[in-house]
Amino acid sequence: MSLPILVVDDSAMARKMLIKSLPPEWDVEISQAGNGVEAIEAYRAGKAAVMFLDLTMPVLDGFGVLEALRKEDLNSMVIVVSADIQPVAQERVMAMGAIAFVKKPVSAELISNVLKQYGVI
């Protein structure tokens, strides 16, 4: 059975690059969202057992998504993928429930290592 994956970023190019970085043998069903509101809707529709989440987006940013997931007690493995590498941002997302923080641009090796670390693949 395919694992539902949600890639959330306001940049279509960034979403495409991240999707290309996913392990080719990984049995997944990939959905995409361009902002935080779309991400929450996709999550509620069952499309996000694992979510790759950008922080800086219009409408609702990644912090807002994490807060909404926490308030609604929704469980998803959230991996934040962001160019914002400030330690404060990293600490904040981890405190809000993210399982990992990956710096953009992503690499296939780094994504695989994070997924293996958390037993996703």
Labelled PLM ranges:
Residues M57:
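Receiver (REC) domain active-site loop signature in two-component systems and cognate sites
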Residues V106-L115:
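C-terminal output helix
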Residues G46-F52:
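Active-site beta3 strand of CheY-like receiver
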Residues A12-S31, M96:
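Two-component/phosphorelay signaling modules centered on CheY-like receiver
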Residues I85-A100, N113:
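Alpha4 helix (beta4-alpha4-beta5 surface) of REC/receiver domains from two-component response regulators
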Residues N35-E38, D61-G64:
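Acidic catalytic/metal-coordinating carboxylates
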